[in-house]
Amino acid sequence: MNMRFSPKALVRQLGRLSLVACLSLGLLGAADWLQPQAAAAYPFWAQENYASPREATGKIVCANCHLAKKPTEVEVPHSVLPDTVFKAVVKIPYDRSSQQVLGDGSKGGLNVGAVLMLPDGFKLAPEDRISEELKEEIGNVYFTNYSADQENIILVGPLPGDDHQEIVFPVLSPDPAKDKNVFFGKYQIHVGGNRGRGQVYPTGQKSNNGVYTASAAGVIDAVTETASGYDIVIRKADGSTVTDAVPAGPSPIVAVGSEVAAGAALTNDPNVGGFGQIDTEIVLQSSNRVLGVIAFFFAVMLAQIMLVLKKKQVEKVQAAELNF
């Protein structure tokens, strides 16, 4: 992305990137030590596994791992002029009193994140184009592009959800006079917003933030608590047994002697988060067209005024003729 920074801003940006990199490496290392694949959180996995975050069907790929559906909202201007900075506000609502299951089975606050898919030509606004007022609204949020050649797709998160249920994206509109691939008109914007951990890792393995089901039909023979969760033993009709291991997090809802069908729930659903996506539209408006519309309405108003004046003039002439 072509950004223009002052020396102080550049040093500040490099320091911020270094801090983010150090924190990310530390979190990834700690998460891997605590539990395998615990660091498999979007948006990093989406970037590594998908060329685009939106499938041909229109589904944003985050929904492949975050199975629960939750609302997501977005606010953008109806129309913008070329080479103009505006804000897109993504809202990710949830009950702040909710706590999610963490990788080790304990409870903690929810994290949030979002993906903003802008039309081609639109991109994250350079720092020197963002007003101080807008910077205050954005806060200390770090944005990244989905890839080096996709400046119009912006990612953010994971972030602490309690402080970021509304995320403000600073966006710069393109100028068709400078970019011949951009045209004035109406465009679509695609938005995805997530709160909480996923239920499935990109590898297909379940996380501990979802329902665990019976691998076979039969009768519950034992429910044993272990250091890592629970072992639930099912005795099948032929007398053989199968053990379903449940990690720390979900709680068993079956008891010894209960009959279960294959695929029936053995645990509750600890997930309190979910993913939602929404589409909206924005118009890249020509300033000449705006001036043309203003001129048209001015001409219409002027014509109406002239008609009223003409009508009054005719009425005066008619009244004078009657008096004569």
UniProtKB/Swiss-Prot annotation:
Heme binds at Y42, C62, C65, H66. GO terms for biological process: photosynthesis. Keywords: Electron transport, Heme, Iron, Membrane, Metal-binding, Photosynthesis, Signal, Thylakoid, Transmembrane, Transmembrane helix, Transport. Pfam families: Apocytochr_F_C (PF01333), Apocytochr_F_N (PF16639). PROSITE patterns: CYTF (PS51010). SUPFAM superfamilies: Cytochrome f subunit of the cytochrome b6f complex, transmembrane anchor, Cytochrome f, large domain, Rudiment single hybrid motif. Residues 1-30 form the signal peptide. The chain crosses the membrane at residues 290-310. GO terms for molecular function: electron transfer activity; heme binding; iron ion binding. HAMAP family: Cytb6_f_cytF. Belongs to the cytochrome f family. This is Cytochrome f. The gene is petA.
